[in-house]
């Protein structure tokens, strides 16, 4: 099967355009959108789409971004990691400020990080309720649901995150008193933004990425 490669723009460090959404996509509230179709993915050398699987090419680094912004949504995807992989699903995020401009659910090899950086965590803000990540090389299934300040994550059928972002009232501080990286209180981060998938140097694979905008 002919290999198709996803659009990767390096005009700014770690910036890719993940062209999985068409203009006016927010009008399709309640309808499931398949994010991995040749028509919807911009093609180039840094991400490869082959037989329905999206993965980084040998060119290192980067985040592949959606063109459209989303607010309330449910997204499901499958991923698998290579050894010592570090990746993430960014959402309600700003491609120009990925570190500070939105949220991330950690995707990583089980066991290489702990606490609020372990697989399934709301990165640097909340550790998962249970350990749910599968070993490297096995497909994981993740569902993230955002509705207003509510963020819920289910990993491999296990609820791992169920938070109200309005509880994060102070910059650089979590409700449990621990510190985080965010210069802005999480409750004040935008309620809409882009999706991103991260490549941090070790291979990770994605498939069956589908989003349902919520009314």
Give residue ranges: language-model regions:
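Position-driven detector of the extreme protein N-terminus
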Residues: 2, 23-26
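Bacterial N-terminal signal peptides that target proteins for export
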Residues: 2-15
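Bacterial N-terminal signal peptides
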Residues: 12-24
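Carbohydrate-interacting regions of secretory-pathway proteins
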Residues: 27-215
């Amino acid at each position: 099967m002919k290999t198709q490669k996803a659009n990767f723009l390096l005009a700014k460090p770690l910036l890719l355009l993940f062209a999985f959404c068409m203009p006016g996509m927010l009008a399709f509230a309640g309808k499931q959108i398949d994010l991995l179709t040749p028509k919807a993915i911009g093609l180039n050398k840094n991400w490869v789409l082959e037989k329905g699987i999206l993965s980084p090419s040998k060119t290192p680094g980067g985040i592949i971004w959606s063109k459209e912004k989303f607010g309330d949504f449910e997204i499901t995807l499958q991923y698998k990691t290579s050894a010592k992989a570090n990746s993430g699903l960014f959402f309600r995020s700003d491609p120009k400020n990925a570190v500070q401009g939105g949220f991330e659910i950690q995707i990583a090899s089980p066991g290489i990080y702990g606490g609020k950086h372990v697989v399934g965590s709301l990165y640097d803000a909340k550790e998962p309720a249970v350990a749910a990540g599968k070993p490297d090389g096995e497909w994981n299934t993740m569902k993230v649901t955002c509705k207003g300040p509510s963020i819920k994550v289910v990993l491999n059928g296990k609820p791992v995150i169920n938070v109200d972002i309005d509880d994060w009232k102070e910059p650089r501080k979590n409700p449990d008193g621990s510190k985080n990286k965010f210069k802005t209180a999480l409750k004040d981060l935008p309620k809409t933004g882009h999706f991103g998938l991260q490549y941090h140097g070790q291979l990770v694979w994605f498939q069956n990425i589908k989003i349902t905008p919520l009314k």
